[in-house]
């Protein structure tokens, strides 16, 4: 079994940067400051012990390193990050 989750608005609280949507680069760059949605992260981490967990995000590939840094900062246990 594979569980699929989203990132912005699911694992990360992203609503605070909605005012930046007119400038996608600024919007995605600001994502490093997103606060974690800890109940969702804890659920994903628990599931990752029993099945594959993939995060499917619409973030562009060029934001992969920033996204990985954020995921590592909050110890999100994923098997795949699909961008």
Regions found by a protein language model. Give the residues of each.
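Alpha-helical substrate-recognition element adjacent to the catalytic core
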Residues: 1-83
